[in-house]
């Protein structure tokens, strides 16, 4: 909590962190098309085309809006502007998050010393994050990561705001807007789902005292929630439509969820109504993915994978074109392969699962050396 004498100062400093980071990002922003996926995202935003799987449809809609703002002749410049703005907002939200964490730890801000510690620490922390290599890099080009970071930041801030007001009437509204934000974020990048454990732990420690039984139950519920969102909504609904259920059967299931939510609200089943309404909000946010299906049927100039049928759309969401590679064994140089994969055991008797396991864990220390020296130190320094 913040004493009323310092609320205005808190708002000024929050705005200051936003403007400082925004002006730096704007000044260093790519003035036109840059490398990697940026050109693709700019072109598909401007034309509402279909980019590479899994699509990022919400980014395309926002990019389309920014492409219509008459501030520069270069369309790429207009779409690029989305990243500095969302990145600066993420920095501002980080400032507000740090203030809430510090005040929760130290207590209410009542004098200048409290204000200096909370506000000063938040400014330093937010600006330190603002100028980290990864965030700054994402903030100056048309990519999904900048706005995905913003959505993660706003979800974290909202759950901390809920924690302050959890004993007040109507606190459920914060949970519902978090669910909606997470639904929208699925149309950007699935990174936002990683905030689920944090949200669950904040809710748990705000409402309960620590006990292993209740803590493990919370962890289990969090896992089930993640499974429902990722496997049953994001990936499951399109698969249902592609299966025997068809689009009509899938629509019936969605309508049933809405009807169940209405029933729970009318009959004042508070916990059930919040859970079902949260699911509805996620579904509404996730509905941005219908734009991929709709636009592909219009055959835009950029129509990657042509996901205009339900089956093709499922393949598009599943990223099937990329294939799959296991995490182990790690790819590194320095030793000779100790076996050659010759196919399934019944076709090649010289290969067995035991050999695969031995190869996977062969010289583990050298695998970790490669991971640390190349994939961490070289890529991030």
Where is each model-derived feature located?
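Transmembrane-helix motifs of polytopic, lipid-linked glycan transferases
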Residues: 15, 81-110, 153-158
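Membrane-interface alpha helices of multi-pass inner-membrane proteins
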Residues: 44-47, 125-127, 174-188
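Extracytoplasmic catalytic/substrate-binding loops of multi-pass membrane glycan-assembly enzymes
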Residues: 29-41, 51-62, 302-306
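Short hydrophobic/aromatic helix or loop-helix immediately within or flanking a transmembrane segment
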Residues: 45-74, 84-85, 92
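Short acidic/glycine- and proline-prone juxtamembrane loop motifs at membrane-interface regions
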Residues: 134-145
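Transmembrane signal-anchor helices characteristic of membrane glycosylation enzymes that use polyprenol
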Residues: 7-34, 129-131, 189, 280-299
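Start-transfer (signal-anchor) and selected internal transmembrane alpha helices
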Residues: 1-23, 108-123, 250-284
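Membrane-interface transmembrane helices that cradle and orient dolichyl/undecaprenyl
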Residues: 107-116, 155-174, 201-212
């Amino acid at each position: 909590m913040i004493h009323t004498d310092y609320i205005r100062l808190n708002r000024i400093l929050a705005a200051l962190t936003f403007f400082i980071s925004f002006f730096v990002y704007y000044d260093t922003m790519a003035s036109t098309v840059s490398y990697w996926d940026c050109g693709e995202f700019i072109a598909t935003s401007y034309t509402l085309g279909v980019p590479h799987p899994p699509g990022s449809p919400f980014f395309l809609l926002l990019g389309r809006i920014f492409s219509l703002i008459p501030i520069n002749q270069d369309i790429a410049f207009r779409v690029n502007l989305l990243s500095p703005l969302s990145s600066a907002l993420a920095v501002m939200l980080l400032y507000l998050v740090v203030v809430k964490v510090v005040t929760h730890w130290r207590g209410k801000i009542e004098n200048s010393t409290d204000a200096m510690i909370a506000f000063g620490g938040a400014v330093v922390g937010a600006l330190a994050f603002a100028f980290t290599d990864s965030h700054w890099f994402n903030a100056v080009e048309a990519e999904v990561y900048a706005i995905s970071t913003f959505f993660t930041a706003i979800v974290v801030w909202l759950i901390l705001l809920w924690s302050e007001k959890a004993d007040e009437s109507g606190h459920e509204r914060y949970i519902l807007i978090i669910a909606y934000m997470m639904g929208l974020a699925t149309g950007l990048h699935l990174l936002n789902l990683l905030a689920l454990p944090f949200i669950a732990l904040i809710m748990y420690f705000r409402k309960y005292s620590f006990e292993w039984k209740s803590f493990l139950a919370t962890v289990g519920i969090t896992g089930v929630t993640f499974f429902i969102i990722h496997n049953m909504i994001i990936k499951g609904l399109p698969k249902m439509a592609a299966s025997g259920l068809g689009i009509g059967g899938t629509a019936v299931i969605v309508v049933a969820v809405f009807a169940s939510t209405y029933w729970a609200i009318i009959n004042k089943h508070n916990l059930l109504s919040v859970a079902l309404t949260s699911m509805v909000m996620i579904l509404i946010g996730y509905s941005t993915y219908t734009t991929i299906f709709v636009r592909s049927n219009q055959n835009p100039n950029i129509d990657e994978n042509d996901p205009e049928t339900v089956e093709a759309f499922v393949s598009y969401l599943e990223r099937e074109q990329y294939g799959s590679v296991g995490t182990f064994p790690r790819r590194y140089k320095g030793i000779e392969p100790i076996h050659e994969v010759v196919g399934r055991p019944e076709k090649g008797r010289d290969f067995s699962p035991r050999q695969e396991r031995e190869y996977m864990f062969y010289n583990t220390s050298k695998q970790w050396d490669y991971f640390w020296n190349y994939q961490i130190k070289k890529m991030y320094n």
